[in-house]
């Protein structure tokens, strides 16, 4: 599993939340998507059994991105795609 954490300002949180939860915008992804859930953040399920979720921490000002894919390099790349899409810097 690949896991990343990003700090944000209140203004930046609003932008990210609008992008993912209101506009429901997603990055261009090469993997076929099975479904998207917005129950606990934005979670994309892939047809290969993998998934990625971007969600805000409930206890600290962090955006967390977690990804599981069949191969570790795929999870790393998927996190990089989300990082670029949301313009996140660690």
For the regions a protein language model found, what residue spans apply to each?
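Phosphate-binding and adjacent anionic-ligand microenvironments
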Residues: 1-90
């Amino acid at each position: 599993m690949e896991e990343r954490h990003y700090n944000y300002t209140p203004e930046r949180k609003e932008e990210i939340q609008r992008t993912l939860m209101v506009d429901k915008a997603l990055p261009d992804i090469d993997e076929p998507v099975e479904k998207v859930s917005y129950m606990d953040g934005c979670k994309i399920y892939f047809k290969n059994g993998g998934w990625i979720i971007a969600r805000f921490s409930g206890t600290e000002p962090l955006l967390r991105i977690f990804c599981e894919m069949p191969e570790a390099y795929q999870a790393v790349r998927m996190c990089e795609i989300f990082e670029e899409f949301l313009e996140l810097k660690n």
